[in-house]
Regions:
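N-terminal glycine-/serine-/threonine-rich beta1-alpha1-beta2 phosphate-ribose binding loop
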Residues: 1-98, 218
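Rossmann-fold NAD(P)-binding glycine/threonine-rich loop
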Residues: 89-90, 98, 106-133
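Active-site-lining helix/loop region of Rossmann-like oxidoreductase modules
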Residues: 11, 154-283, 287, 291
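Short, ordered loop/turn segments at secondary-structure junctions
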Residues: 38-40, 81, 100, 106-110, ...
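Alpha-helical support elements that line or immediately flank enzyme active sites
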Residues: 144-155
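Conserved active-site and cofactor/substrate-binding residues in soluble primary-metabolism enzymes
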Residues: 11, 15, 19, 62, ...
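Gly/Ser/Thr-rich loops at beta-strand to alpha-helix junctions
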Residues: 14-16, 83, 109-112, 116-117, ...
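C-terminal active-site/capping subdomain that shapes the small-molecule cofactor and substrate pocket
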Residues: 238-366
Length: 366
């Protein structure tokens, strides 16, 4: 990996984008040269003030040509929205074709390009080849805890019979209606049919992770099964979206299950509640957001992970509760990867073929 300073543009000043701005500014091997914003109200404002209230002398813009003229080596792409890929693919194509590498938290299924939407993959491969650039998607989940980490544990195994990864979360402070209600079905009675109930929705969203693990272990996935269950609350729950009354959905559980040799061998298991009292018979995390990775084999491995952040306000995300540590970890998965992605061969990258994206200049007193 080359030691030269990489020029960076951050795309969006939402939670992940804001954290990325601060992180890039701290790194002597990275130089923040520009920031893209969607809202006209943010255009012309100091990007540092938008991120965490501290001016940095870089003016936010929505002019892509102006940002490309800055000759960045890489863009940290952190835009969000209900139709993420639909909006992001044209941006990725333009950046890659211009010779700018991309690290992204937006397109979660791109963590495994081999299982990405074929049309999107072909378009991105062509753009990357034309510009001689690379694109890499990551995050904490997906992108690390329930896909890369199990493979790390497997390096100490003689045999592996099953991989089971859990995300155990309390989402009472998450106030995005199109996700919480429309997609997941929280706060609604059982006759409400959210997006996640559509046949193939869960398998489609998580097949990349399952195939990533299978590729790493050298096995073939014969089928991907899916399950979805929900439980009603029997008492009112105060949430960021208002009060959820008794008789409405207060917890959901969904699984994507990879079948290998006729067995359910790889399981991604998400259990999400609005309050800890709902569905007490389901596994409960050690904290409001926890992850559990279980490998059954020789030897067995079980690991609990709870990402936390002592001072979310200092980090620039004062309204975040239990998810603050995970949000920062998501940002750092791509920020730390920047030098490796810029120096990689052109194309669509995944962690399986990359070196560990170890952070440089991260060891300090605080």
């Amino acid at each position: 990996m080359a030691d030269d300073v990489k020029r960076v543009v951050v795309w969006s000043t939402g939670g992940i984008g804001a954290l990325s701005i601060v992180a890039v500014q701290e790194r002597p091997d990275l130089e923040l040269v520009g920031v893209w914003v969607h809202s006209e109200e943010k255009v012309g404002k100091d990007a540092g003030e938008l991120a965490n209230g501290v001016p940095i002398g870089i003016t936010a813009t929505n002019d892509v040509d102006a940002l490309l003229a800055l000759e960045p080596d890489c863009v940290v792409y952190a835009a969000s929205g209900p139709e993420r890929d639909a909006g992001a693919i044209p941006d990725y194509e333009r950046l890659l074709a211009a010779g700018v590498s991309v690290v992204t938290t937006t397109s979660t299924t791109l963590i495994n390009p081999m299982a990405y939407v074929p049309d999107h993959r072909v378009r991105l491969e062509a753009a990357a080849a034309a510009g001689g650039a690379s694109i890499f998607a990551s995050g904490i989940e997906p992108g690390f805890l329930c896909d890369q980490l199990p493979l790390v544990f497997s390096t100490a195994c003689r045999s592996v019979s099953k991989v089971h990864c859990y995300e155990l979360a309390l989402y009472d402070d998450y106030g995005v209606e199109e996700i919480m209600i429309d997609a997941l079905g929280f706060g609604r009675p059982l006759d409400f049919e959210p997006w996640i109930m559509l046949p193939g929705a869960i398998a489609g969203e998580f097949q990349g992770q399952i195939r990533y693990i299978a590729d790493g272990l050298g096995v073939e996935v014969e089928d991907i099964r899916e399950t979805y269950d929900r439980r009603l609350t029997d008492q009112p729950i105060d949430t960021a979206l208002g009060t959820v009354e008794p008789g409405n959905c207060g917890a959901i559980r969904f699984q994507a299950i990879g079948v290998v040799d006729g067995r359910e061998a790889i399981v991604i298991d998400h259990i999400t509640r609005l309050a800890r009292h709902v569905a007490p018979d389901w596994p409960i995390g050690e904290a409001d957001l926890s992850y559990r990775v279980v490998l059954e084999g020789k030897p067995n491995f079980e690991c609990w992970i709870t990402p936390t952040l002592d001072d979310p306000a200092e980090a620039g995300i004062p309204t975040m509760g239990s998810g603050a540590g995970a949000m920062l970890a998501t940002a750092m998965r791509v920020v730390n990867a920047i030098p490796y992605v810029v120096d990689a061969q052109p194309g669509l990258l995944r962690s399986l073929e990359m070196p560990l994206t170890l952070p440089r200049h991260a060891v300090r007193a605080s």
